Amino acid sequence: MLEQGESVPAVTLTDADGVDFALDVYQGKPLVVYFYPKADTPGCTNQAKDFTALADDFAAAGVPIVGISKDKPAKLKKFADKYGLRVILASDESGAACEAFGTWVEKSLYGRKYMGIERATFLIGADGAILRVWPKVKVKGHAAEVLEAVQGL
């Protein structure tokens, strides 16, 4: 997994409307990027809703929020519309961003091993360097913790 001080890799993602973009479009301002396993599942829904509840505070700090999963753009669009989400949802169908950030990892459930996205959040500085990493995120209270870090910039 990428660590504090490392540069954000050049990756192309697709937003919920099917438009391709690169994270470097946000260069020049801080950015929060969070990786989550799957849209419209309980933990991922709560996480997106928590960031949405604080969206005005992040916006006041001038910090966009991008949530990344391997879901198709159409699924992300339905997810955003269903819950009124106010974060940028991005599709990484190829897994290139997950690989580059180091969030595509071996997981284990009831003794069965499989590959999946580790829930993680990255606070990225205006210069494109990672300022802070939250690996293995527990959803409850996480968005508020990230906001506190953002407000401390």
Predicted regions and their residues:
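Chalcogenol-based redox active-site neighborhoods
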Residues: 1-153
